[in-house]
Amino acid sequence: MATLRSPFRYDFVGSFLRPQAIKTARAEFKAGEITREQLTAVENEQITLLIEKQKRAGDHAITDGEFRRSYWHLDFMWGFAGIDEIELDHGYYFQGEETTHGSIRVSGKISGENHPFVEHYKFVKQFEDENCIARQTMPAPAQLLAELYREDNGKNTDAVYPDHEQLLQDIAAAYRTVIRDLYNAGCRSIQFDDCTWGMFCDPNYQAFIAQAGVKLEDQANEYLRLNNLALEGRPADLALTTHVCRGNYHSTWASRGGYAPIAPILFAHENVDAFYLEFDDERSGNFEPLQYVAEGKKVVLGLITTKSPRLEDKAAVIARIHEAEKYIPLDRLCLSPQCGFASCEIGNKLTDLEQWNKLKLVKEIAEEVWGK
């Protein structure tokens, strides 16, 4: 167990397609037809089956597939004291699709005591063995800050927190509490999921904030500072990684653009062990920004797409790995899909079998490049 530290040569980002049993049970719970305990029993059963599949696939990380969540990010945010669940009159906009309308509203001092995800983690941890370690995924602190200022949310946030620095400090402290509680529960692998950096890469967003008189570098540095504040004092044996995302809803995307605008900030200065980076299509740009990754940090190349069932050509993927090697040594590189398979309940447009075929391909390529 002591030698298992994320990331792994063949890896995955966290979420899996929701089984129909989960979808049905959640719908029945929402309609008041079953109790919370009955829903939890279904979730436990389906998560157990998922972990069995992860182990059979040879994965060294195990997760709950985010089966207990509606969204990859909001459910975690709703677990903080001082954060309320709300519905907006619209969702997030992707290419040709709109998500459901969930969001958050700050209602008091933000804190992280008794976060429900700690219990979620404990359920997964019981399945650890000498070949696998339980991993907890969560939205990055910067993602919470971005949601608090998403469109009209910012007016309420500023009313509750007129001192912006206090807001940053409270968010960071809340995360430190959750990280501490997870660590005390035995967690040694945490993954931040962070779409803010993918957003910063997008020319449309860059133009939007420029019109508002905001400098991209200033906003990026604030988000970096917040993430690092949340990581202060983390134990040396706790692996913490960041997945940078450009949106992944029902096989669509939200932002585009290479990593050049953020690389000198994020890659050089975020206090994590590794970055999971999307590189599955031209929206992600080239590998040149990898030159900014700080010494000792690893990069997990997201070269296999979860947005399509089509299996990538092995030789082409291997060639791209060696192309990335021009900027970062091969022993600091790993391979994974570019994102999860279901960032929310709806999931991407592929079947359960196609999902596992993708992960099988990741493993086969990794073993060919780095050995078994």
Residue ranges and their predicted role:
Residues 1-372:
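Domain-level signal for soluble alpha/beta catalytic cores
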